[in-house]
């Protein structure tokens, strides 16, 4: 259903006004709202950061987070996060459209986006080709990333130049910026996206995902999946430690997009006190998905990588724990009620 700009803006304001750091930006002709992103929680260390934005224009209002890269029209956001407002929103759209019914033109089939692939990563070098004393090698060693996984990771000192080679015009100035580059392949082994992880602590965006075309895959690791359960984690680096591990990039949690429906097991970060994590776990449990719980874990770190590098866990120990702590349906609801601390 096509949207109506003034209705989009009204419901965006109503849906977002309660969020922390909400403000309306009045320095341009475009209707803009700024807020802390409810999808990723924005920054855990800086409560003043607000990287969620709503942009209203003459076509359709959209929400975008510059931290987790979540992007959706306001109608989709309402449907996912504000179902009561969504029903009212649909009613208002239908009521407004019912006032005048233009003569319907024959519907044209929507053009399918051209499925481009990323044939090369200019200005990058693969980690397994670098010398042991290179700074990025020291970085991945410090994170305990296995050496046999280095071939899946790349490094660049010219991130803006790399991005502009795939998405021209993204950066006006191609200044030097080092990032760990993580290519994202489709099931056929063709790269469609890549994620850049900031190496500077003060970088405004820790993770940035770049797509070759609008519908490009943002599911990491699918080209390496074998038989058996598939573990869906929150970050590409965590997935490198897990057999048959894949990862969600871009901050979205769309069950229709994630593959391996009959085999997947969701492994969210160990954050029983984080409202967004518990909200997403609840959504998965209510949808009948298989979910892995950290409630009996001997490790207290937030994610798999920290459990290994900070607490001395091995990938084998974590895999064994995960296999024995999967729940679904009523059992999952019971585990979640005990696990959640909010």
Curated annotation (Swiss-Prot):
GO MF annotation: an example: DNA-directed RNA polymerase activity
Source organism superkingdom: Viruses
Protein EC: 2.7.7.-
Keyword hit for Secreted: no
Keyword Zinc: yes
Annotated binding of Zn(2+), by residue: 37, 40, 65, 68
Alphabetical GO biological process terms: DNA replication; viral DNA genome replication
Enzyme class: transferase
Alphabetically ordered keywords of this record: DNA replication, Early protein, Metal-binding, Transferase, Viral DNA replication, Zinc
SUPFAM superfamilies: DNA primase core
Family of the protein in this entry: Belongs to the Tequatrovirus DNA primase family.
Job of this protein: Synthesizes short RNA primers for the lagging strand DNA replication. The primase synthesizes short RNA primers on the lagging strand that the polymerase elongates using dNTPs. Recognizes two trinucleotide sequences 5'-GTT-3' and 5'-GCT-3' in vitro, but uses only the first as the priming site in vivo.
Record text on subunit structure and interactions: Monomer. Hexamer. Interacts with the DnaB-like replicative helicase; this interaction forms the active primosome complex, which is composed of 6 helicase and 1 primase subunits and expresses full helicase and primase activities. Interacts (via C-terminus) with the single-stranded DNA-binding protein. Part of the replicase complex that includes the DNA polymerase, the polymerase clamp, the clamp loader complex, the single-stranded DNA binding protein, the primase, the DnaB-like replicative helicase and the helicase assembly factor.
HAMAP family reported in the protein's UniProt record: PRIMASE_T4
Full protein name: DNA primase
Upper taxonomic lineage: Viruses, Duplodnaviria, Heunggongvirae, Uroviricota, Caudoviricetes
């Amino acid at each position: 259903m096509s949207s109506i700009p003034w209705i989009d803006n009204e419901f965006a304001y109503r849906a977002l006004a309660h969020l922390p750091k909400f403000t309306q930006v009045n320095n341009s002709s475009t209707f803009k709202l700024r807020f802390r992103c409810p999808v990723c929680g924005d920054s855990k260390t800086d409560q003043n950061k607000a990287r969620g934005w709503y942009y209203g224009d003459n076509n359709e209002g959209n929400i975008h987070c510059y931290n987790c890269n979540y992007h959706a029209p306001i109608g989709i956001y309402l449907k996912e996060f504000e179902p009561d407002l969504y029903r009212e929103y649909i009613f208002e759209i239908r009521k407004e459209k019912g006032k005048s019914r233009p003569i319907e033109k024959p519907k044209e089939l929507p053009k399918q986006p051209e499925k481009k692939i990323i044939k090369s990563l200019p200005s990058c070098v693969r980690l397994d080709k670098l010398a042991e004393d290179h700074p990025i090698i020291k970085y991945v060693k410090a994170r305990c990333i296995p050496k046999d996984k280095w071939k899946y990771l790349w490094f660049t000192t010219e991130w803006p130049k790399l991005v502009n080679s795939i998405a021209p015009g993204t950066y006006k100035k191609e200044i030097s910026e080092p990032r760990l580059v993580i290519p994202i392949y489709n099931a056929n082994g063709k790269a469609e996206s890549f994620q850049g992880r900031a190496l500077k602590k003060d970088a405004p965006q820790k993770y940035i995902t770049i797509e070759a075309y609008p519908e490009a895959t943002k599911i990491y690791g699918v080209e390496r999946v074998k038989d058996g359960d598939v573990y869906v984690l929150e970050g590409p680096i965590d997935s490198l430690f897990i057999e048959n591990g894949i990862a969600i990039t871009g901050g979205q949690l769309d069950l229709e997009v994630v593959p391996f429906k009959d085999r997947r097991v969701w492994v969210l970060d160990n954050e029983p006190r984080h409202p967004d994590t518990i909200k997403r776990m609840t959504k998965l449990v209510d949808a009948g998905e298989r979910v892995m719980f950290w409630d009996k874990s001997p490790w207290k770190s937030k994610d798999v990588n920290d459990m290994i590098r900070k607490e001395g866990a091995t990938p084998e120990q974590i895999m064994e724990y995960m296999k024995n702590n999967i729940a679904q349906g009523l059992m999952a609801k019971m585990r979640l009620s005990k696990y959640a601390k909010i």
